[in-house]
């Protein structure tokens, strides 16, 4: 079956035909920044028209939270005016094909899970450490989306009760300590300010301030991993994102994990899918859950 997959982010919307995990006819446009509600309706309509007659179903991976087809977020400001956008209904105006939607990190998780040996790994987590910290959880070979679509927002678990206020409004979330945004919040205040990319360059040169900042991030992720393993019996975790894949970061996370009792540890690997993880994961998930198992529940 051929899927029209859409990946809706804060700055771009990617679209492609996905068949058997392979990307075809990929295109990318800017997410509307002005008149955003009408602009999004128009953008979706154009993309559906571009691929008319070429797909059997639609799969959407989107930033934010998808609940009953409505787009929202823990921090609505991140959506730039698209909070409570009727995403599924907007797409349904242009096609009568089946439509499934889920969060982009959940979709990426499902893509990464397709590379695992299902018999050996039934409990799996994907963590993306980038501008923010997000992820997804697979338990008993089933991707967890939750009754409200929020399952997997692991970046908003507690890392430091005395830490910085997170964008979600809570104090001390993992995201407020480990993310690229959190790193930049500190490094931009230095006498010699820099962005996260340069922080890592300085870290690799053993700069004291940069090393302390990167270590702080890696410790938060190591503790997050330990919490996930001990609470959910996770067998393997894949780490991605611009921070998570930065040279030297994963080995630092693993170093801190070695300080814990072994029961808190599991196998860690780098994420294999790149920018198309959301497209591929959404296509697989909608096919597996909505089309191949019609008795299953679709959130989104």
Swiss-Prot record:
It comes from the Bacteria. It catalyses: an N-acyl-D-mannosamine + ATP = an N-acyl-D-mannosamine 6-phosphate + ADP + H(+). Keywords: ATP-binding, Carbohydrate metabolism, Kinase, Metal-binding, Nucleotide-binding, Transferase, Zinc. ATP binds at residues 5-12, 132-139. Catalyzes the phosphorylation of N-acetylmannosamine (ManNAc) to ManNAc-6-P. Belongs to the ROK (NagC/XylR) family. NanK subfamily. Zn(2+) binds at residues 156, 166, 168, 173. Disulfide bonds: none annotated. Its EC number is 2.7.1.60. Pathway: Amino-sugar metabolism; N-acetylneuraminate degradation; D-fructose 6-phosphate from N-acetylneuraminate: step 2/5. This is N-acetylmannosamine kinase. It comes from Haemophilus influenzae (strain 86-028NP). InterPro entries: ATPase_NBD, ManNAc_kinase_bac, ROK, ROK_cs. The gene is nanK. PROSITE patterns: ROK (PS01125). Homodimer. HAMAP family: ManNAc_kinase. Gene3D superfamilies: 3.30.420.40. GO terms for biological process: N-acetylneuraminate catabolic process. One of its GO terms (molecular function) is zinc ion binding.
């Amino acid at each position: 079956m051929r899927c029209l997959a859409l990946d809706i982010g804060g700055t771009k919307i990617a679209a492609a035909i996905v068949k058997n995990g392979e990307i075809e006819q990929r295109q990318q446009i800017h997410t509307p920044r002005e008149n955003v509600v009408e602009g999004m309706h128009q953008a979706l309509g154009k993309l559906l028209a571009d691929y008319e007659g070429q797909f059997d179903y639609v799969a959407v991976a989107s930033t934010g939270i998808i609940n009953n087809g409505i787009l929202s977020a823990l921090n609505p400001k991140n959506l730039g005016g698209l909070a409570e956008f009727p995403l599924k209904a907007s797409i349904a105006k242009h096609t009568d094909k089946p439509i499934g939607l889920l969060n982009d990190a959940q979709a990426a998780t499902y893509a990464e899970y397709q590379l695992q040996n299902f018999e050996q790994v039934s409990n799996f987590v994907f963590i993306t450490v980038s501008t923010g910290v997000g992820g997804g959880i697979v338990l008993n070979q089933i991707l967890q989306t939750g009754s409200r679509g929020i399952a997997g927002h692991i970046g908003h678990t507690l890392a430091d009760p005395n830490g910085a206020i997170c964008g979600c409004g809570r104090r001390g979330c993992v995201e407020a300590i480990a993310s690229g945004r959190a790193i930049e919040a500190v490094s931009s205040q230095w006498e010699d300010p820099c962005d996260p990319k340069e922080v890592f360059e300085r870290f690799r040169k053993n700069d004291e301030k940069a090393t302390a900042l990167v270590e702080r991030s890696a410790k938060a992720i190591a503790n997050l991993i330990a919490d996930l393993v001990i609470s959910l019996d996770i067998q393997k975790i894949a780490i991605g994102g611009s921070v998570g894949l930065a040279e030297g970061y994963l080995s630092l996370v693993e170093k801190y994990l070695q300080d814990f009792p072994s029961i808190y540890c599991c196998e860690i690997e780098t994420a294999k899918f790149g920018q198309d993880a959301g497209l591929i994961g959404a296509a697989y998930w909608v096919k597996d859950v909505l089309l191949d198992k019609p008795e299953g529940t679709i959130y989104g």
